[in-house]
Regions:
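Accessory recognition modules or surfaces
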Residues: 117-123, 151, 207-209, 213-229, ...
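Sec-exported extracytoplasmic/periplasmic mature domains
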Residues: 91-95, 117-118, 154, 158-165, ...
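Extracytoplasmic/secreted proteins, especially bacterial periplasmic and envelope-associated proteins
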Residues: 58, 81-85, 108-111, 148-151, ...
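His/Asp/Glu-enriched short active-site or ligand-binding loop at hydrolase and phosphoryl-transfer sites
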Residues: 179, 183-220, 254-265
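N-terminal pre-catalytic segment of deacetylase/amide-hydrolase enzymes
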Residues: 1-84, 113, 244-245, 252-282
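Acidic-and-aromatic substrate-binding clefts and catalytic sites of carbohydrate-active enzymes
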Residues: 69, 77-78, 101-110, 173-180, ...
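Structural recognition of the beta-strand scaffold that forms the well-ordered cores
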Residues: 59-62, 97-101, 123-126, 170-174, ...
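Active-site beta->alpha N-cap acidic-glycine motif
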Residues: 33-126, 130-142, 155-168
């Protein structure tokens, strides 16, 4: 009987090897330090106009999201200073780009600012908080005094952080592109590289998208920085112009990059591609 009961008893489970303790999650890698230019003469803020004129046909499309500090009432009345159709087109075409954003624009459109800042296709750079001129006589813009210039730039960065832009770049575009020695000296402590351009898109207040596209296509050379705008009310033709420009430049063998990559090339070092950004071939 004892033998029969032993035969009917369920087999003992085999001893299990001890499970390894779960590994701690790896710490996120620190963001790479964006390339900048060395200070200019007398330690002034350096100014970048274009990348190397080499056989590597690269071009950077840049877009100014330039709502001015005193335009809040116009936005409240329905004027649109954003351009979601343009951003959607850049995403659909897989075009990396640099957006020079004012702090006031980011305040008005925080969700869009955050979306741009978190999309690896784009990089967000500084276009001041107020979009007031840093010199006199600059396209009729109000002016910011020399003793407030640095604060205006730093206020924009503070807004970017507040709305959730994780990694705004240390690049600054002067409102209207207007600057002088006083402005360069005032911004030296901010540690930014001023970014100008060598190709004017001419989209501000333009009504002919084909004319804007022709102006860009006629001006682009290897290493070019193209200035356009990300504002529906002031630049309504930009999206259509971009849809014309992008395939044509690719047909000519150009590769679209962000400004950081051109600055890295100017410094003689390659900027590694960021995760999630497709390699774009012409």
């Amino acid at each position: 009987m004892a033998t029969a009961l032993a035969a009917c008893a369920p087999p003992r489970p085999a001893p299990q090897a001890p499970r390894p303790a779960p590994s701690a999650p790896s710490a996120p890698s620190a963001p790479s330090v964006p390339p900048t230019l060395a200070p200019g003469p007398s330690g002034l803020t350096p100014v970048f106009h274009h990348g190397p004129r080499t056989g590597d046909r690269t071009v950077a499309l840049t877009f100014d999201a330039d709502m001015t500090a005193d335009q809040g009432p116009r936005a409240a009345a329905g004027e649109r200073f954003d351009h979601p159709g343009l951003i959607a087109a850049l995403r659909a075409l897989e075009v990396p780009a640099t957006v020079f954003m004012t702090g006031r624009w980011a305040e008005e459109y925080p969700d869009q600012a955050r979306s741009l800042g978190r999309d690896p296709l784009f990089e967000v750079a500084n276009h001041s908080y107020s979009h007031y001129a840093f010199t006199g006589d600059c396209y009729g813009l109000p002016t910011v005094s020399a003793d407030r210039m640095r604060a205006d730039v730093e206020r924009a960065y503070a807004v970017f952080r507040k709305v959730g832009v994780p990694d705004p770049k240390p690049y600054f575009r002067f409102p209207g592109g207007c600057y002088d020695r006083t402005a360069l000296k005032a911004l030296t402590p901010a540690g930014v590289t001023a970014v100008q351009w060598d190709v004017v898109g001419g989209d501000a207040f333009a009504t002919d998208a084909e004319a804007v596209a022709r102006q860009v296509l006629d001006g682009v050379r290897p290493g070019s920085v193209v200035v356009l705008h990300c504002t529906r009310s002031a630049a309504p033709t930009t999206e259509r112009a971009v849809r014309r420009v992008v395939p044509e430049l690719r047909r000519r063998g150009y590769r679209f990059v962000r400004v950081s990559e051109l600055i890295a090339a100017a410094n003689g070092r390659a900027e590694p591609p960021r995760a999630g950004v497709p390699t774009l071939e012409p």
